Amino acid sequence: MAQGTLYIVSAPSGAGKSSLIQALLKTQPLYDTQVSVSHTTRQPRPGEVHGEHYFFVNHDEFKEMISRDAFLEHAEVFDNYYGTSREAIEQVLATGVDVFLDIDWQGAQQIRQKMPHARSIFILPPSKIELDRRLRGRGQDSEEVIAKRMAQAVAEMSHYAEYDYLIVNDDFDTALTDLKTIIRAERLRMSRQKQRHDALISKLLAD
């Protein structure tokens, strides 16, 4: 069976990354593509399901996992830990399923060091003006918060060249097509096709 591919997807807040991933999943069978489920020490929010939205663990459990190098990457955010389990990712990839990991550039660097065969995709907004409009469109943040988010977005975007693929989300449908095209091209790579069609190739080349 062909090994699945791990896709690292990064973007500044407001670039449409989460919407694109969710739209992609709706077009892909579950046995082809999944989103990585992270471990976290924060409390579940209403409606969140253990193992579906996150794997909820306590601080001691998380630190024990860190001590045995169980995470591909982990970070502390607002006094809570978040991490991507190496074992969970590898188990899914071994079944031939592609896994999408929604993560920032720092986490992406950690992942690439431990899984150099992962493919990485960066999503850009079409302009700063449009990014500002999208950030303001939420209608919940002060000018100070918006300015901080914009500064964080610029810092995130400065790492775009570290990625394998670049998508500009100007038109959503076009960006989604670009994302699908990347997945299709990766599935047609020689290494994956040789595994997938090993029996056929053997028969075709037999005397």
UniProtKB/Swiss-Prot annotation:
Protein name per Swiss-Prot or TrEMBL: Guanylate kinase
Chain sites annotated for binding ATP: 11-18
Record domain Guanylate kinase-like: where: 4-184
One of the record's GO molecular function terms: ATP binding
Superkingdom, taxonomy of origin: Bacteria
Record bears the keyword Nucleotide-binding: yes
Record PANTHER family: GUANYLATE KINASE, GUANYLATE KINASE-RELATED
A Pfam family matched in the record: Guanylate_kin
Similarity comment text for this entry: Belongs to the guanylate kinase family.
Reactions it catalyzes: GMP + ATP = GDP + ADP
Keywords: ATP-binding, Cytoplasm, Kinase, Nucleotide-binding, Transferase
GO cellular component: cytosol
Function of the protein: Essential for recycling GMP and indirectly, cGMP.
Localization, UniProt: Cytoplasm
InterPro entries from the UniProt entry: GK/Ca_channel_bsu, Guanylate_kin-like_dom, Guanylate_kinase, Guanylate_kinase_CS, P-loop_NTPase
Entry's EC annotation: 2.7.4.8
NCBIfam families linked: guanyl_kin (TIGR03263)
